């Protein structure tokens, strides 16, 4: 029989001191993000396939667009399922879809079959990313939620230089025919380990259980967490400061995302993620091809790509240090302006040294923004009752731009060269910076429950 008393899981989670429990939740989510690098190897796989004669600019655009289309569907449907079934079940389900599609894709007999598998990879990955980034915010305290989320993004985005290093090591040892296949099998095996860890150690979100009115289950999970924290710290827990009104949770229908305060947040989140998708995935999927278009050979293009991609973890490390020190709106606007300016300067370079140096700093700022957008700001702006649905809808809308962008990049690269591509990226960045400045909300240091009360009350 369900208990009547509301467990106030949010306030109880927020009062917990940082300890090994937080670190274990962080480690599971971060490792899951680190090894799900099917998207990170996209550009490297395409470079190998181009050497094999499997692809040209048009096919590359299709490969990139179909990946984004899959991620669009995964993000859209994944949030609905995740809000219905819970964070833990969604985590495991989406990992299974992603792993299976990578294994099957690794044995593709031709490009058409690989593109079909790539779509399914995108579905699994799109749903998984929404679940991990948005769901993780429910486990962490509001006082340093941005820092914890940045740490997750920091570890997760080591996948880009890591898979580039693996590609560098594999290129002289394995033929191109087998190289790209191995690059898909490696993350599949590692993701299987992540799934096993989630199955064994990852609890359901007490906040989610409470939002569904499952008070007895929420209380059981919450007590288990609190008892573990007391054992780990050897100290009594601080008093609970109730942030909500104690009322029973309200159901938030999907239609609520299309009106009022929540619609404004959908528009805001979508804009933030449009900039992220267009800039990040253009660089991931096209940078090696851009280098080859400039006359740089395959080996050197992979080396340049690898050196540039080390800016990814460095950028997120910097973001981790400053995330809870700078207002969210200020940080988003500032990063987008820097990306627009530096991207244009980068497009004018011909020296290998300057390409490497400026490319490193460009990727640094891009991944500071990626951390800000995907791991912190967009996941923060939703009430628990609709967190995955809201985040997934914004992700889905944001990914529509990623479907069209590869074709625009292909045309611009062929007609106007590298500069044309980076003018497009700069224009998108400036438009979204204006959107954040005008309709953005401030979430730094604000509790999940405070955001929920405001949004649900005005839905």
Q: Predicted segment positions?
A:
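Transmembrane-helix signature of 12-pass secondary carriers
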Residues: 1-459
């Amino acid at each position: 029989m369900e208990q009547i008393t509301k467990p106030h899981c949010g306030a109880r989670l927020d009062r917990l001191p940082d300890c090994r429990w937080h670190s274990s939740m962080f480690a599971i989510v971060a490792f899951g993000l680190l090894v799900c690098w099917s998207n990170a190897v996209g550009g490297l796989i395409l470079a190998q396939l181009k050497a094999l004669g499997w692809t040209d600019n048009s096919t590359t655009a299709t490969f990139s667009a179909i990946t984004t289309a899959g991620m669009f569907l995964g993000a859209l449907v994944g949030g609905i399922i995740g809000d219905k079934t819970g964070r833990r079940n969604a985590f495991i389900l989406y990992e299974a879809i992603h792993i299976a599609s990578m294994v099957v894709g690794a044995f593709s007999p031709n490009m058409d079959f690989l593109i079909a598998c790539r779509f399914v990879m995108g579905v699994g990955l799109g749903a998984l990313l929404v679940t991990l980034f948005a769901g993780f915010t429910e486990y962490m305290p509001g006082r340093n939620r941005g820092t914890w989320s940045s740490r997750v993004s920091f570890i997760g985005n080591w996948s880009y230089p890591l898979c580039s290093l693996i590609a560098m090591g594999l290129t002289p040892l394995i033929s191109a025919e087998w190289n790209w296949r191995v690059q898909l099998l490696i993350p599949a095996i590692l993701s299987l380990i992540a799934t096993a860890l989630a199955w064994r150690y990852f609890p359901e979100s007490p906040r989610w259980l409470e939002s569904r009115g499952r008070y007895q289950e929420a209380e059981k999970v919450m007590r288990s967490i609190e008892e573990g924290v007391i054992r780990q710290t050897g100290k009594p827990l601080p008093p609970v400061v109730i942030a909500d009104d104690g009322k029973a949770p309200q159901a938030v229908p999907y239609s609520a995302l299309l009106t009022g305060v929540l619609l404004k947040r959908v528009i805001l989140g979508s804009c933030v993620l449009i900039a992220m998708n267009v800039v990040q995935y253009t660089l991931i999927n096209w940078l090696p091809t851009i280098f080859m278009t400039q006359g740089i050979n395959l080996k050197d293009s992979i080396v340049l790509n690898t050196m540039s991609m080390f800016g990814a973890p460095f950028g997120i490390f910097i973001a981790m240090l400053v995330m809870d020190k700078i207002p969210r709106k200020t940080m988003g606007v500032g990063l987008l302006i820097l990306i627009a300016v530096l991207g244009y300067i980068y497009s004018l370079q011909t020296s290998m040294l300057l390409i490497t140096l400026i490319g490193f700093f460009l990727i640094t700022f891009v991944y500071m923004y990626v951390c800000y957008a995907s791991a912190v700001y967009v996941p923060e702006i939703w009430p628990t009752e609709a967190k995955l649905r809201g985040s997934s809808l914004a992700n889905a809308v944001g990914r529509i731009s990623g479907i069209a962008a590869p074709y625009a990049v292909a045309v611009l690269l062929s007609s106007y060269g590298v500069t044309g591509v980076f003018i497009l990226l700069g224009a998108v960045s400036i438009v979204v910076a204006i959107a954040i400045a005008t309709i953005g909300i401030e979430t730094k240091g604000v509790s999940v429950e405070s955001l929920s009360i405001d949004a649900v009350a005005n839905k």
